């Protein structure tokens, strides 16, 4: 899948295990991608556009994917955490009775741990107000994880992705 500093997901992608990496169009706006990645033998990932785009196709997304999900990894950004559109989407997920796991990305923007702590407390409080309970929250840096996977392995620990990976594998 494409990645970048601006939104790159304009469609829903169903990502699952397969021997090659072709993309197949399943229906309008939904694509299937297979990849020879071992952990995909045990789970499928549904990658969606950001919440501003999702709200416009809210009914289709919820009726096709959320009811079948074991849990939803909801990604928010550390620089604009838990926006109003994100809050509305989490409320919709809650209506289906699905477990929500929150991922706070871009934690590498903070110079002090106290700044990250403040954002995590805000996200926890906001999620609790919508869900009635505080979901698991994983602070990560996708940028550092990507650099770690592409030649700078010393950055892996700073990305904090390991805890999220363990959670997903255990789920």
Question: Each predicted region: which residue ranges?
Answer:
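Residue-level signature of catalytic and energy-coupling elements of molecular machines
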Residues: 15, 47, 70-73, 141, ...
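Short glycine-/polar-rich loops that comprise or flank the Walker A/P-loop
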Residues: 8-12, 41-42, 67-72, 95-100, ...
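Conserved G1/Walker A P-loop phosphate-binding module
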Residues: 1-48, 53, 94-95
């Amino acid at each position: 899948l494409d990645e970048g500093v601006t939104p790159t997901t304009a469609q829903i992608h169903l990502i699952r295990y397969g021997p090659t990496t072709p993309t197949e169009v399943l229906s309008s706006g939904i694509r299937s991608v297979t990849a020879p990645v071992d952990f995909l033998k045990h789970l499928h990932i549904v990658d969606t556009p950001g919440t501003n785009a999702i709200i416009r196709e809210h009914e289709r997304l919820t009726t096709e994917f959320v009811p079948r999900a074991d849990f939803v990894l909801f990604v928010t950004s550390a620089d604009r955490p838990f926006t109003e559109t994100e809050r509305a989407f989490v409320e919709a997920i809650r209506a289906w009775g699905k477990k929500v796991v929150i991922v706070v990305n871009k934690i590498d923007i903070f110079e002090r741990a106290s700044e990250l702590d403040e954002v995590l407390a805000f996200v926890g409080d906001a999620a609790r107000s919508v869900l009635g309970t505080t979901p698991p929250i994983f602070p990560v840096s996708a940028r550092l994880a990507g650099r770690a996977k592409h030649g700078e392995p010393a950055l892996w620990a700073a990305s904090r992705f390991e805890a999220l990976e363990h959670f997903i594998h255990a789920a």
